[in-house]
Amino acid sequence: MSRPRIVFMGTPEFAVSSLAACFELGDVVAVVTQPDKPKGRGNTVTAPPVKELALSRGVPVLQPTKLRTPPFAEELRQYAPDVCVVTAYGRILPKDLLELPTHGCVNVHGSLLPRFRGAAPIQWAIAHGDTETGVSLMVMDEGLDTGPVLAMKRMAIAPDETSASLYPKLAALGGEVLREFLPAYLSGELKPVPQPSEGMVLAPIIEKDQGRLDFTKPAVELERRLRAFTPWPGAFTTLGGKLLKVHRAQARGGSGAPGTVLASGPDGIEVACGEGSLVLLDLQPEGKRVMRAADFLQGHKLAPGSQPFVAG
């Protein structure tokens, strides 16, 4: 076929690489993204990154507050899309929109489906201790990331990987999977394959309180969750009734009652967990900068055997 007419739907920085790929692969006739939102301490109304790229390329931008309305479907129909490419748009598409393009809607998802269906696949892959992840290109249906898969691209998860470091790598991989496989799908050469029934794991949206360190849990689990929830919501505990963020930690094999300080010094603050121990390396007291444990201890005496942290 000649250059396909593409409607792109996406919102955050993660989707920018996919949109850039679409500009190479066809004519992007419209971009659908979430409405501008207040951001930062000043609550400055900010456009989504996808919108900024679209406007720089002179592409019409649609920012509906609701998708399930006939007027929006009709507006989209006027662009006569051959395919809709969706990457991290942030909303579930109704059936009439899924069926509107000639070749339906395809989605770039940040996991190896069916593992980690849902809103936070990058975070949960790290939290589960997976050593491999990737992106999946699938044909969308009405379910939550349940559509048949066209292709996958894989990559290793490093032992010290955080969501912050993995995010741009998978975003770039999303652009690659589109460049490599979207043309073959549109030509009919590549057929989607149903997802296997086994191996499904959900990746629900992250809530702020999930960053709280529960020292009754295994240290390995806490260390993974710290990396998974970096940068948001971060890992935190309380000390003396005040918030204490933990930016870097290491799992060890120490033992003791959960929440007990086993050792404290230049090498960190070792806290007993339900299984093993967690050495706190970089900390941020409430209202202050991030600092090494050694600097933190200059103003806070945490003697071995003390229990300054809430265990659960």
Curated annotation (Swiss-Prot):
(6S)-5,6,7,8-tetrahydrofolate binds at S111, L112, L113, P114. The keyword Ribonucleoprotein does not apply. The keyword Heme does not apply. One of its GO terms (cellular component) is cytosol. Its EC number is 2.1.2.9. Keywords: Protein biosynthesis, Transferase. It catalyses: L-methionyl-tRNA(fMet) + (6R)-10-formyltetrahydrofolate = N-formyl-L-methionyl-tRNA(fMet) + (6S)-5,6,7,8-tetrahydrofolate + H(+). It is an enzyme of class 2 (transferase). GO terms for molecular function: methionyl-tRNA formyltransferase activity. Belongs to the Fmt family. Attaches a formyl group to the free amino group of methionyl-tRNA(fMet). The formyl group appears to play a dual role in the initiator identity of N-formylmethionyl-tRNA by promoting its recognition by IF2 and preventing the misappropriation of this tRNA by the elongation apparatus. This is Methionyl-tRNA formyltransferase. It comes from Myxococcus xanthus (strain DK1622).
